[in-house]
Design a protein with these regions (language model features):
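N-terminal active-site segment of His-dependent metallophosphoesterases
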Residues: 1-58, 75
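Active-site neighborhood of divalent metal-dependent phosphoester bond hydrolases
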Residues: 49-56, 61-119
Length: 119
């Protein structure tokens, strides 16, 4: 068995698809498959790129069909922390919303949140 380790896609679905084709994956029935290899996605699917949701959909379909495995990266972890409150402590979000750090965090996640809202 051959494994292709792929990380830091950051919402660049078109580049991901080009890479998969270059590695020998073929799109059949809506997902990419390889005749003998498995893709191992090591996170950072979102932030920065223009097609973050499509990137997640490509990876999800591959995992669902058994042609890939995936783990969450720090960018996905940060997005979850942005939306999650700490009920055991202050009730604040796990990732700051206020102050200079909050402005940075909001900017980092805004493109993805906007893309989700447009669906």
């Amino acid at each position: 068995m051959t494994f292709h380790i792929i990380g830091d896609i950051h919402g660049h679905a078109e580049k991901l698809e080009a890479l998969l084709r270059k590695l020998g994956y073929v799109q059949t029935r809506g997902t990419y498959r390889h005749p003998y290899a498995t893709a191992i996605f090591v996170g950072d699917f979102i932030d920065r790129g223009p097609h973050q949701l499509e990137t997640l959909n490509i990876v999800r379909r591959m995992v669902d069909m058994g042609s890939a495995q995936a783990v969450m990266g720090n960018h996905e972890f940060n997005a979850i922390a942005w939306q999650t409150t700490d009920h055991d402590a202050t009730g604040e979000y796990l990732r700051p919303h206020g102050g200079p750090k909050g402005t940075h965090n909001r900017y980092q996640h805004q493109a993805f949140l906007t893309e989700l809202q447009n669906q």
